[in-house]
């Protein structure tokens, strides 16, 4: 469809995780890290050296894990468009209007293993972790990098 909005709808918060559910996600992350370290320790010396070189050349292949952040809340999200961990995101709902959240104030967590993702998009099961206390159904938007004021873009949909 045509749009002249400066924003892209990026995701919807579908569920606020309970403290127990948050702890399960953090345990999943911890278990993943332990398994990754154990696998590394069981490698042959030359394989360890190769892994360390690869980690230096391609750090994105070895994501950090989520760790507890005091005072933060974890939410299951339904991603609709790409969100990057370098984006400034905004939360919008009936009780909040455009709360900006800088990249340092949120994390994207992979729901399968508890690692921190650098990006997420449609069909990636994931969580947003942030100090913002939000309600279910809150929308997450990002600024459209292709936005031009006064120009309506037709995507052909």
Pin down the residues of each PLM region:
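Surface-exposed amphipathic alpha-helical tracts and adjacent flexible/coil segments at the periphery
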Residues: 1-157
């Amino acid at each position: 469809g045509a749009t002249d909005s400066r924003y892209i709808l990026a995701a919807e918060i579908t569920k606020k995780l309970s403290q127990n559910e948050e702890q399960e996600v953090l345990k999943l992350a911890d278990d993943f890290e332990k398994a990754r370290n154990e696998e590394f320790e069981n490698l042959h010396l030359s394989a360890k050296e190769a892994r360390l070189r690869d980690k230096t050349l391609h750090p994105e292949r070895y994501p950090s894990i989520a760790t507890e952040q005091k005072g933060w809340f974890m939410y299951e999200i339904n991603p609709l468009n790409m969100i990057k961990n370098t984006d400034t995101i905004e939360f919008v709902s009936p009780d909040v209007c455009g709360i900006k959240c800088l990249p340092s104030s949120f994390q994207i967590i992979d729901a399968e293993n508890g690692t921190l993702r650098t990006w997420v998009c449609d069909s990636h099961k994931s969580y947003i972790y942030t100090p913002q206390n939000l309600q279910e159904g809150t929308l997450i938007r990002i600024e459209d990098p292709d936005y031009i004021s006064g120009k309506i873009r037709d995507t052909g949909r």
